[in-house]
From Swiss-Prot:
This is Palmitoyl-acyl carrier protein thioesterase, chloroplastic. CDD domains: 4HBT. The lineage of its organism: Eukaryota, Viridiplantae, Streptophyta, Embryophyta, Tracheophyta. Residues 29-40 have a biased composition (Low complexity). It comes from Gossypium hirsutum (Upland cotton). Belongs to the acyl-ACP thioesterase family. Residues 1-57 form a transit peptide. It catalyses: hexadecanoyl-[ACP] + H2O = hexadecanoate + holo-[ACP] + H(+).
Length: 413
């Protein structure tokens, strides 16, 4: 009913011509009165511009309504033109609605202060420097920062891993496997990391955009070195440097393999002849045991979400397990500035692990390193088999960390 009423306001219902004519005729001696529809909207015909014939304006005589015997004029006959709705009323209503909506929007005053924090115009990156370097930007998300309001070390490591995979894809080397070339897929080979070295000069914060550059080089006869350089995309400040060594492993036998010539032919054109972005940490990693470890965390087990597509624990997860045994006072007053990891064997989903840590003062005489701590780490299975050996370096977060440093020293004593 409402729809009918609204429609009739713009498109009036007309009576049939027969009934209209019959009302205008004389019925015996009674003269009919003109019928006027109360809901109709009429348009004057003589309001239109006069027509032109052969370039000459032709005069027209306004159409007059018919007159009855009393001399009263009857309305002009109904046509399609004078039954059209008054569109000006409809346009005025639409304009009013838009103006009201615009006013309401202005009252909200929603204006983002930093567009770079809410806009993510990043794809999978691009190949630069003659096709040898891959570059990709990342925006630091709110769920990627920790208690210090800075990106966690796991976030940075995930960025390194993501750029490595995207580098292979952009170079056209990604086969059916995860990070494996077509020839590697044919031979059931995968890449595994054996050594990782990272130095963090400064951690990015929420909303920062970091640029990660990565490239690969040869490492001996059967290895590949991958380097990363992380910087602030706006200022160019170097934030993180990392280098790693990778070797091949047979996915079925889980044994290390030499690089086949077919695979070497695929990857060598992308090798960059350059020195490592970090000098190799030549200091030997110490093997801890129950007698030398100061902090032990037992009962660590992988979750299903910790496994990658190759059905072994993601190497980034190992870092989280190593830090499980780091003393809380160090985590509260210091930040991780460097780490060196040696991966000894893979870890499956049914493994049960132990994390061991021991703390030592910085053995350097450089005054810049005053207040720093070095930690030795071991991640092992319950049966004693080594998974990862590691060393981390921690620097004070701020000048007020001296109280926590005294607490750490007291606990060790």
């Amino acid at each position: 009913m409402v729809a009918t009423a609204v429609t009739s306001a713009f498109f009036p219902v007309t009576s049939s011509p027969d009934s209209s004519d019959s009302k205008n005729k004389k019925l015996g001696s009674i003269k009919s009165k003109p019928s006027v529809s109360s809901g109709s909207l009429q348009v004057k015909a003589n309001a239109q511009a006069p027509p032109k014939i052969n370039g000459t304006v032709a005069s027209t005589t306004p159409v007059e309504g018919s007159k009855n015997d009393d001399g009263a004029s009857s309305p002009p006959p109904r046509t399609f033109i004078n039954q059209l709705p008054d569109w000006s009323m409809l346009l005025a209503a639409i304009t009013t609605i838009f103006l009201a909506a615009e006013k309401q929007w202005m009252m909200l005053d929603w204006k983002p202060r930093r567009p770079d924090m809410v806009i993510d115009p990043f794809g999978i990156g691009k190949i630069v420097q003659d096709g040898l370097v891959f570059s990709q930007n990342f925006s630091i998300r709110s769920y990627e920062i920790g208690a210090d309001q800075t990106a966690s070390i796991e976030t940075l490591m995930n960025h390194l891993q993501e750029t490595a995979i995207n580098h292979c894809r952009s170079a056209g080397l990604l086969g059916e496997g995860f990070g494996a070339t077509p020839e590697m897929c044919k031979k059931n080979l995968i890449w595994v990391v054996t050594r990782m070295q990272v130095v963090v000069d400064r951690y990015p914060t929420w909303g920062d955009v970091v640029q990660v550059d990565t490239w690969v080089s040869a490492s001996g006869k059967n290895g590949m070195r991958r380097d990363w350089l992380v910087s602030n995309s706006e200022t160019g400040e170097i934030l993180t440097r990392a280098t790693s060594v990778w070797v091949m492993m047979n996915k079925l036998t889980r044994r290390l393999s030499k690089i086949p010539e077919e695979v070497r032919g695929e990857i060598e054109p992308f090798f960059m002849n350059s020195d490592p972005v970090l000098a190799e940490d030549s200091q030997k990693l110490v093997k801890l045991d129950d007698s030398t470890a100061e902090h032990v965390c037992k009962g660590l087990t992988p979750k299903w979400s910790d496994l990658d597509v190759n059905q072994h624990v993601n190497n980034v997860k190992y870092i989280g397990w190593i830090l499980e045994s780091a003393p809380l006072p160090i985590l509260e007053s210091h930040e991780l500035s460097a780490l060196t990891l040696e991966y000894r064997r893979e870890c499956g989903r049914d493994s049960v692990l132990q994390s061991l840590t021991t703390v030592s003062d910085s053995n350097t005489e450089n005054a810049v390193n005053v207040g720093e701590f070095n930690c030795q780490h071991l991640l092992r299975l319950d049966d004693g088999a080594e998974i990862v050996r590691g060393r981390t370096r921690w620097r004070p977060k701020h000048a007020k960390s001296s109280a926590n440093m005294d607490q750490i020293t007291a606990k060790r004593a």
